[in-house]
A protein has these predicted regions:
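Gly/Pro/Ser/Thr-rich low-complexity, intrinsically disordered segments predominantly at protein N-termini
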Residues: 1-233
Length: 233
């Protein structure tokens, strides 16, 4: 008699999607503010053990893939630098230190309610809201700092966690270092600086070539003089 073993159904691994197919931002102003802030923070934190992620799923409960949120910009310290498809707290061992939401009237309730409560429970040290269209926030840029288990408003616009002074410039968040007051350039300004430095280098090389050419021409003239009149006294 042949005894058949019961069929064992394979256990499917839990999937943690990296995207829901929704647009990154609802308007150009929101997208631009996110992209600029993301790039400036990445440049600022280059060389440090940190990563800056934008509009990517943050999973905060292992085994529960629906327990997720997608901050517009988040900064995480004490993790490997570089991008990720998504961020799982239990794998990385660190919660985001700072989160930015580029808010609007349509996301107002979620940003000031559910997300603020969630980020406080997670232990996110600073939570910043920026309203590029100035639709609903009394202050267009408002930060909150975690004290105990609740957030308190940041009055002076200073991110102590990042070491930066935050302000508004033409629908974008501008950043200045707290230690020396240096302004972090916007990507367009950084590109202009690179172009100016490149042009200055080209100008210096051209001037050097012209000087060498003039020297060679002078030596030719002097040699002709010597050939005709002899050495100069």
């Amino acid at each position: 008699m042949v005894i058949s073993a019961p069929a064992i159904k394979p256990v499917n691994p839990i999937e943690y999607p990296s995207s829901d197919g929704e647009p990154v931002a609802e308007t150009y102003d929101h997208f631009y503010a996110i992209a600029i802030l993301l790039e400036m923070l990445r440049q600022y934190l280059t060389g440090r053990q940190a990563t800056v992620l934008g509009n990517q799923y943050l999973y905060y409960a292992q085994g529960l893939p629906r327990m997720r949120v997608a901050p517009d910009v988040m900064v995480i310290f004490e993790v490997a630098a570089g991008g990720r498809d998504n961020y799982k707290i239990w794998e990385e061992g660190q919660v985001p230190a700072v989160i930015f939401e580029i808010t609007s009237k349509s996301t107002q309730i979620t940003d000031i309610g559910f997300k603020r409560d969630l980020y406080a429970q997670m232990g996110v040290l600073e939570y910043w809201l920026f309203d590029p269209k100035n639709e609903w926030l009394e202050q267009q840029l408002q930060g909150y700092r975690l004290k105990g288990e609740e957030y308190e408003p940041i009055i002076a616009g200073q991110s102590l966690v990042l070491g930066l002074q935050l302000s508004i410039e033409d629908k974008k968040i501008a950043l200045h270092r707290l230690d020396n007051g240096e302004k972090l350039p916007f990507p367009s300004e950084l590109a202009e600086q690179v172009n100016q430095e490149r042009q200055a280098k080209l100008d210096a090389e051209q001037a050097k070539l012209q000087a060498e050419q003039a020297k060679q021409e002078l030596e030719v003239l002097l040699q002709r003089y010597r050939d005709r009149y002899g050495d100069l006294e």
